[in-house]
Swiss-Prot record:
Native organism: Saccharopolyspora erythraea (strain ATCC 11635 / DSM 40517 / JCM 4748 / NBRC 13426 / NCIMB 8594 / NRRL 2338)
Subunit structure: F-type ATPases have 2 components, CF(1) - the catalytic core - and CF(0) - the membrane proton channel. CF(1) has five subunits: alpha(3), beta(3), gamma(1), delta(1), epsilon(1). CF(0) has three main subunits: a(1), b(2) and c(9-12). The alpha and beta chains form an alternating ring which encloses part of the gamma chain. CF(1) is attached to CF(0) by a central stalk formed by the gamma and epsilon chains, while a peripheral stalk is formed by the delta and b chains.
Gene name in the database record: atpA
Function: Produces ATP from ADP in the presence of a proton gradient across the membrane. The alpha chain is a regulatory subunit.
Record lineage: Bacteria, Bacillati, Actinomycetota, Actinomycetes, Pseudonocardiales
UniProt name for this protein: ATP synthase subunit alpha
CDD domains: ATP-synt_F1_alpha_C, ATP-synt_F1_alpha_N, F1-ATPase_alpha_CD
Keyword Cell membrane: yes
Span list, region Disordered: 510-548
């Protein structure tokens, strides 16, 4: 048997070699423990270094957001199925703030507030991830609003115009057509999208907060049928979602829009509606035991909406001249616009369109109350042609409303007042539009020209809308060059106005009203006097009495 020899030098060199090549790896991980959970909220003990609004990882791939940082525990909002979170489970820090994937592949898709597709059409390839809480553009990074955002709705484009980069509030009671106005505005961007011009194209985002699933499906179907879904992203947080997801949905939508805005593109974003976001945030704050304020809302509910809506802007040329236009929606109760959340959002936005339930129920749709609706951008967001034909429209309608209320009590009116009432009734008919029927800007100009210049005065009120649609079709057939000139120059020339006026007078001669008569104004006929009514004028002269 061979003798076993041990070399101490070899053993020493082997140990030295191992020690010299050894690099100790130290890992440090903060782990917290769930102390209690319920209603989409979890309290976590531990995590001393956690940051505010940091993403926390719960078991089962569920995430939460750290909201309350207290001495002994952290209050977190759970983003997902909170019933799977149990007391005693471990919670880990991620070291990241909440972000969503963004990119052009989101067009035509329906996603949740975390950017995950929920339409069953497969995964979405993201260009990058964008944090939800980002600073809005500063004052020097912005420029004034000067480009019109055509809605295709005559009542808005004529009296409360919206510009690219503006925040225009849609406010009113439930079931007054707020969502319809917003969806029609999205549909109206189809012509710009099909033009292929990046300066005209508008990418649209519809954020549904706390809506019924059937309502969201109806909006998606309307956009699909109109061919508008290909340039629209739907961010859905339905009523069945947790308060945390409803709270985050608007920020997710604006992050997707900001990605395009900073690339120099134009974006339209609809928040439907911010009342439900405020209610979800109120629920979160009360569950986290934050002190309540007016109407039980937390003290920072104004900041909740202001930091969201300030992200809508028209960027300066140095920043790429992109824009993001916001259409926030607020639901009122009993037409009360002086409540807490409505007054907050009114003070943040650049104007509001108030939709009144009384007008809606009377058949005036869209039910926009011109009296308290306003756009603080004004004429700078209108093309010259619309500004020319609607100069005094808002004042005329306000006077019509006042006179209409007065005429309900007056037994006799003078001819001027009657003419004003007749003109006002026809203007109100011109401003009516059906759902899903936005008009191109050149047809808006022609319709408003007919109403404001008195060319509909001889048309019966019940026939105004039929006359309008048939006349627009007639203009397309016979004077398409006038309409194309309005689109190209954005102006209504004197020759164009004369052509429209002359064509309207000719068209009225061939238009038949519902009573079977011609719409052309009839010449007043002089009535012949009867023989016994004809009398000789007599002159009586009083002579002074002769002097005596």
């Amino acid at each position: 048997m061979a003798e076993l020899t041990i070399s101490s030098d070899e053993i020493r060199s082997a140990i030295e070699k191992y020690v010299s090549s050894y690099s100790p790896e130290v890992s440090r991980e903060e782990v917290g423990v769930v102390t209690d959970t319920g209603d989409g909220i979890a309290h976590v003990e531990g995590l001393p270094s956690v940051m505010t609004e940091e993403l926390l990882e719960f078991p089962g791939g569920i995430y939460g957001v750290a909201m309350n940082l207290e001495a002994q525990e952290v209050g977190a909002v759970i983003l997902g199925e909170s019933d799977k979170i149990e007391e005693g489970q471990e919670v880990r820090r991620t070291g990241k703030v909440l972000s969503v994937p963004v990119g052009d592949d989101f067009l035509g898709r329906v996603v949740n507030p975390l950017g995950e597709p929920i339409d069953g059409l497969g995964e979405i390839t993201a260009e990058e991830n964008r944090a939800l809480e980002l600073q809005a553009a500063t004052v020097v990074q912005r420029q004034g609003v000067s480009e019109p955002m055509q809605t295709g709705i005559k009542a808005i484009d004529s009296m409360t115009p919206i510009g690219r980069g503006q925040r225009q509030l849609l406010i009113g009671d439930r079931k007054t057509g707020k969502t319809t106005v917003a969806v029609d505005t999205i549909i109206n961007q189809k012509g710009n999208w099909e033009s292929g011009d990046p300066q005209k194209q508008v990418r649209c985002i519809y954020v549904a907060i706390g809506q019924k699933g059937s309502t969201i499906a109806g909006v998606k179907r309307s956009l699909e049928e109109a061919g508008a879904l290909e340039y629209t992203t739907i961010v859905a947080a339905p009523a069945s979602d947790s308060p945390g997801l409803k709270w985050l949905a608007p920020y997710a939508g604006s992050a997707i829009g900001q990605h395009w805005m900073y690339q120099g593109k134009h974006v339209l974003i609809v928040f439907d509606d911010l009342t439900k976001q405020a209610e979800a945030y109120r629920a979160i704050s009360l569950l986290l035991r934050r002190p309540p304020g007016r109407e039980a809302y937390p003290g920072d509910v104004f900041y909740l909406h202001s930091r969201l809506l300030e992200r809508c802007a028209k960027l300066s040329d140095e920043m790429g001249a992109g824009s993001m236009t916001g259409l926030p929606i607020i639901e009122t109760k009993a037409n009360d616009v002086s409540a807490y959340i409505p007054t907050n959002v009114i003070s943040i936005t650049d104007g509001q369109c108030f939709l009144q339930s009384d007008l809606f129920n009377s058949g005036q749709r869209p039910a926009i109350d011109v009296g308290i609706s306003v756009s603080r951008v004004g004429g700078s967001a209108q093309i010259n042609a619309i500004r020319k034909v609607t100069g005094s429209l808002k004042i005329d309608l306000a006077q019509f409303r006042e006179l209409e209320a007065f005429s309900a009590f007056a037994s006799d009116l003078d001819a001027t007042s009657k003419a004003q009432l007749d003109r006002g009734a026809r203007l109100m008919e011109v401003l009516k539009q059906g759902q899903g029927e936005p008009l191109p800007v050149e047809e808006e100009v022609v319709s408003l020209f007919l109403g404001t210049k008195g060319h509909l005065d001889s048309v019966p009120v019940e026939d105004v809308r039929r006359f309008e649609s048939e006349f627009l079709a007639h203009m397309r057939r016979t004077h398409d060059t006038v309409l194309k000139d309005i689109v190209e120059t954005k102006k209504l020339s004197d020759d164009g106005a004369k052509t429209i006026a002359d064509t309207a007078e000719e068209f009225k001669k061939q238009f038949t009203t519902s009573s079977g008569e011609s719409a052309a104004p009839s010449e007043p006929e002089a009535e012949a006097l009867a023989a016994d009514e004809v009398g000789q004028e007599t002159v009586k002269v009083n002579r002074p009495a002769p002097k005596k």
